[in-house]
Amino acid sequence: MNSITTPRMGATILRTIAPNVGVLSQVLPLGLRRVYPRGVRWVSSEIQQKDRQAGESNTATDTGVIHKTEQETLLYFDNVYARATSLWNPALWYNVLLRNQSRESVREKIKNLASPPDNPIHGLQLRSTIPVKRDGGVFATFLVPFNYTKAEVNTMIQQNTLNESKNSLFSYFTRATAFPVKGSPWIEDLKRLPSTTVIIKCQGPPLTEEEIYSLFRRYGTIIDIFPPNDTNKHFRVKYRSYRGAICAKNCVSGIEIHNTVLHLQYENVVKGHLIRNFYVTHTRIAIPVTFALLSILAVLIFDPIREFFIEQKITHQYQISWDNRYLKQLKNLTNSTVSTFKNYWGYDSSIISKRHLWEERIEKMDDLKMWLEENNNTFVLIRGPRGSGKHELVMQHTLHNRNNVLYIDCDKLIKSRTDAKFLRNAAGQLGYFPIFPWIDSVTNVLDLMVQGLTGQKSGLSETKESQFRNMLTTSLMAVRRIALKDYQSTINDAGDDVNIKEEDYLQQHPEAKPVIVIDRFEGKADINSFVYKELADWAAMLVQMNIAHVIFLTETVAANQRLSESLPNQVFKTMILSDASKANSRNYVLSELVEHYHKSLKRAKKAEEDEPTEKASPEHSQYDENDPRRYLSEELIQDIDDSLEPLGGRMLDLQAFVRRVKFGELPKEALDKMIEQASEQITQIFLSDKIDPLKSAQAWELIDLLSKNGKVYFHDIVFRPLFKAAPEIGILELENNGLITVSRDRGVLKEIRPFKPLYRAAFQYLIDDEDLKTVLMTRYHLKVINFETGRIKKWEEELRALGKINDQKLFKSRLDYLSKKITTSSDVINHCEDEIKKLSQESNNRRK
């Protein structure tokens, strides 16, 4: 027998360890010994004395041992708190946030359960409560009344607790139970979460399974009892629920039976990390599946939001702007009221509004409105040169009263240099929000990592083509929702319910379908050319589903081929916009200026009434109300007529001319400034040193030819030296860059004209300015010299190779050909050098 002796103040603590049973005893002075039962949790007097000396408490919460007298009874109340069966149990948050867990509240609850008002236990006093929040229960110490025994009090408390718990509406979940504590519980707050299995450590001879069952069954249904074996030296009792295991552990732990002390603790359930193991053992499957789930989750969350914002982009329902349908209605109401008063006073505002368009444009506007109302697969292609007013005709005059218009500018998409910029521009055009361009770089890195780990790509990263296609797909769903917003599958017709299909509804209500306007649709581009194909396919799908009207605005005929590929069996409604005739241009300019001077005259008259010293500009009242001479002088009208000849009928140029005249410039002055501005643009874009020498020389040669004649035939250009190598490529590049426009006959280039009428005057301006012409002609001749010199070098290399052959008679014809070519190019170089000398002499003479 072994013993540990600790002398302290005349007392000795002995721990006697028998073969199977440990006995705690304290040796007192005079050789007396106090033996403590093995089932009692005991703290040595030395520890208690040190606690008292340090001023620390010896409560059960701090020491883990509950102290009670023989007149007190200890019970355990279950289900007072939520059990911490796991660290992420949401019931714990409910416990903390929504339930009153103060000490007074818990004591009041225990009192009501043990001694309710309708069945009180007289003389019963609640001495202390020790919460065990991890287990969801409370240890309560009661003072036993003198007229009751402990057994009677325990029975009455158990019965009262059972009865009181049944009164709750959620009694199945919140039912509390009370059990007398038979052992000596150890109050610990270690990180040992409850489980349904209890481990029983026997300090002494082991009990039988029957004894274990009899002792533990009262706390809950037992699924199985596992006796000790070679690998596990202790009993294990598995309960069906947490309640049974928790109550058994807190009520039985520390009990002594047949000189055997039972110590209970929860089985530490080691849960397998299924997710971690799945990722480690099945990486090639787990990572793609994870990314797929994340993608699905993102679609479920963000796609409805994006559809909502696309709808707002089209309808402007919640946008504070004049495109908002409610503000439009208010504006129309106000305009109609004002128009009524104006008509009453003899002022027709509808006539003034139509002055902004000439007669042909009004007819085309009416045709476009009629096509939208016909509702027969509306697929409209409007073609016209740059500046012909396509956008103004469609957006400002035809669709300005519609509440469901989506405008897409292809130029902003095509000119996006980076993928992130492209996606942002595309999202802005469609109203696609939210968008996360930065995710692309992240997914690319992840894709590389996954490829390095698994040997295959995850498929998470997407190209900008696929992302743009997804944007269009989401936009299609939003367009369909707008078109079918007021659709009802069943309507009441004369008391009968009539079923209506979606197709029939859309066919009968063309105004419900949104209008998609795709501007600057060229069909080909150096970068991001996929945009044209995707937009064409998307528009074709919209038209085939009959959920939208689609209008394409283009400058070239190349768009026809792209659209024909997307809709091979569809007949396009084509509208061609050309420059206005001189008469229509004159009427447009005069009507704009008459309206401006009419308003200015009214303001001047009002100012004259307010300040008599001022004089209003005279009004020629002898002319009719609609006669421009009533407001404009004949001299001004003559200057306008003279300016319109070089200005032409291009809409944007006419508008710019009108603005300049309104701001006070004379017509001749406004025209000269516009010509000078156009010539500067031509010089910077086509004739600067930064441009390819060959292209710059080709541009100047055409400028020289077109300044003399309004048009040049293509067959006259083919045989010129600068165009001889690739005539069509050179002409088409200049056309795409906006210097010239080319007409075609059955697909073959025919006539070459300036890009717009004003350019011919700009060409003439460049030719007539002697100093500028000298610089440009000198630069042109130098570029021709460089071009011919390069050709001669190439031919000389071939001659050098042929000169090494002994019998040169075999290549006499080739040698003669190369000789003639070199002679011709040399003559061209000599001619250019002579011209440069002549230009230099003329320049010097002008300076003198």
Curated annotation (Swiss-Prot):
All ranges on the Mitochondrial intermembrane side of the membrane: 306-848
Kindly report the protein's main subcellular placement as a broad class.
mitochondrion
Subcellular location(s) of the protein: Mitochondrion inner membrane
Q: Which CDD domains match?
A: RRM_Yme2p_like
Q: Does the record carry DNA repair as a key word?
A: no
Q: Does the keyword Transit peptide apply?
A: yes
Q: Which GO terms describe its molecular function?
A: RNA binding
**What positions does the domain RRM occupy?**
196-269
Q: Which GO terms describe its biological process?
A: mitochondrial genome maintenance; mRNA processing
What SUPFAM superfamilies does the record point to?
Answer: RNA-binding domain, RBD (SSF54928)
Q: Which Pfam families match?
A: RNA12, RRM_1
Region entry Disordered, spans: 603-627
Q: State the family named in the UniProt similarity comment for this chain.
A: Belongs to the YME2 family.
Biological role stated in the UniProt entry: Plays a role in maintaining the mitochondrial genome and in controlling the mtDNA escape. Involved in the regulation of mtDNA nucleotide structure and number. May have a dispensable role in early maturation of pre-rRNA.
Protein name per UniProt:
Mitochondrial escape protein 2
